[in-house]
């Protein structure tokens, strides 16, 4: 199977998992990126089975609306049963690196609200130790140099992602060459740097369920 076929398979598996648990008042949190887009396309076939969605980015909101799925602001939603999103890396404990698409802050907020966070990914994203994929950090622009210096002290090699502004108007610094053996601790340490909005480690709030697309089929991992 190609990577695209694996993404489509896990997206469909996520739809199959949540669909029996949805009703006409349900609102689904939806992530950002190519795998999340596959989920949106699969979910759209059942748009009459739920009320609408909360989007983690402007791009996701546009895709949902393009399918005729109502999009709600998170502040107007009191209950979010599911959040479905992809990942750049996951370890076996379902700690994640996310943010390759620069939507990490909104993704983290929606994940925090959701009762169940379902991560969907192809098998290449499961790694023994996080960090081969550069760790994205969202930063207030005026703090760029200060944050970069602090990231060096933490053992990373920070690289400014040129030409990218987040939906929140901030910049991204990607931290290379880190072997992340304690993701909960590192997430907190980076977030404590003044000028950091958040970073792409989802360890304080990891995924609850990982649907992994492999050549042998979709595998389900839980914490």
Swiss-Prot record:
PANTHER family in the record: RIBOSE-5-PHOSPHATE ISOMERASE
Organism: Pseudomonas syringae pv. tomato (strain ATCC BAA-871 / DC3000)
Keyword match Glycosyltransferase: no
Residues reported to bind substrate: 32-35, 85-88, 98-101, 125
EC numbers, comma separated: 5.3.1.6
Function description: Catalyzes the reversible conversion of ribose-5-phosphate to ribulose 5-phosphate.
Enzyme class: isomerase
Domain of life: Bacteria
Pathway: Carbohydrate degradation; pentose phosphate pathway; D-ribose 5-phosphate from D-ribulose 5-phosphate (non-oxidative stage): step 1/1
GO CC aspect terms: cytosol
Catalytic residues of the enzyme: 107
Pfam family, one: Rib_5-P_isom_A
Molecular function GO labels: ribose-5-phosphate isomerase activity
Family to which the UniProt record says this protein belongs: Belongs to the ribose 5-phosphate isomerase family.
Subunit structure: Homodimer.
Protein name listed in UniProt: Ribose-5-phosphate isomerase A
Transmembrane segments: none
Keywords: Isomerase
Phylogenetic classification of the source organism: Bacteria, Pseudomonadati, Pseudomonadota, Gammaproteobacteria, Pseudomonadales
């Amino acid at each position: 199977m190609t990577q695209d076929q694996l993404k489509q398979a896990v997206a469909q598996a996520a739809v199959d998992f949540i669909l029996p648990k949805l009703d006409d008042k349900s609102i689904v949190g939806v992530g950002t990126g190519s795998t999340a887009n596959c989920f949106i396309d699969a979910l759209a076939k059942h748009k009459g089975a739920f009320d609408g969605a909360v989007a983690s980015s402007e791009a996701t909101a546009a895709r949902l609306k393009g399918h005729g799925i109502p999009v709600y602001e998170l502040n107007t939603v009191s209950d979010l049963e599911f959040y479905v999103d992809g990942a750049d890396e996951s370890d076996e404990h379902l700690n994640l690196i996310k943010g390759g698409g620069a939507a990490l802050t909104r993704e983290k907020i929606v994940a925090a609200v959701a009762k169940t966070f379902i991560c969907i990914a192809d098998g290449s994203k499961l790694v023994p130790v996080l960090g081969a994929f550069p760790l994205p950090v969202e930063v207030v622009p005026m703090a760029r140099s200060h944050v970069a210096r602090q990231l060096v002290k933490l053992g990373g090699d920070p690289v400014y992602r040129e030409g990218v502004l987040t939906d929140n108007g901030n910049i991204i610094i990607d931290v290379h060459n880190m072997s992340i053996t304690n993701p909960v601790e590192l997430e907190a340490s980076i977030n404590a740097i003044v000028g950091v909005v958040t970073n792409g480690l989802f360890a304080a709030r990891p995924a609850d369920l990982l649907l992994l697309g492999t050549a042998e089929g979709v595998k389900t991992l839980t914490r």
